[in-house]
Amino acid sequence: RDVLGSRGLGDVYKRQLVACERASQALFIKQMLARPLAREIARTGEPDFCVLAAPGYQCDPAIKGLNSSAAVVINFQERVILVAGTGYSGEIKKSIFSVMNYLLPVEDDVLPMHCSASMDPVTHETAVFFGLSGTGKTTLSANPTRLLIGDDEHGWSDMGIFNIEGGCYAKCEGLDAFHEPEIFNAVRLSLIHI
């Protein structure tokens, strides 16, 4: 259930090895991370970060000074992320983006952004939509007259705006075929919702 993927574009990306306890987590993160080509894996060597997704591991709050048995722990020195005590696959994605928020500006001169983005197919003008989770970024970016760049996490560099992810992160609860037809139809193609 190990998944090797990357986040970013061209030479501006970080590779992660994600070891998952559950197959559903591996399926989720495989869709969210860009999948590197064999030649890219050979060229870049070891992953930049290792993510351990262990929903079955419960932290002892008394020993660790936590307020819950679930935890997301990031060790920048060892380049390891532990997602423990939670089966919510979104924590894997969000923990990797937290690392990208720190590393991209420092190591690659890229501004990471929690936003959606689309592009006019004729003028190539880009629209960027910022907002908290659940505020409509995905809906705004899924405009049938524009090209979707991505719906949640982007980078802004000298090359322009690019999607950090390899997939989209649409919320499925309450989707309406009339108001959000592109998103509604896209999730109907999937066999599993995580």
Task: Label every model-predicted segment.
Residues 21, 26-56:
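Extended, Lys/Arg-enriched charged tracts that mediate electrostatic binding to polyanionic substrates
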Residues 139:
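Conserved Walker
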Residues 16-19:
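Short Lys/Arg-enriched alpha/beta "domain-start" segment
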Residues 136:
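Conserved glycine(s) of the Walker
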Residues 114-132, 142-145, 155-192:
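Glycine-rich, often acidic-flanked micro-motifs
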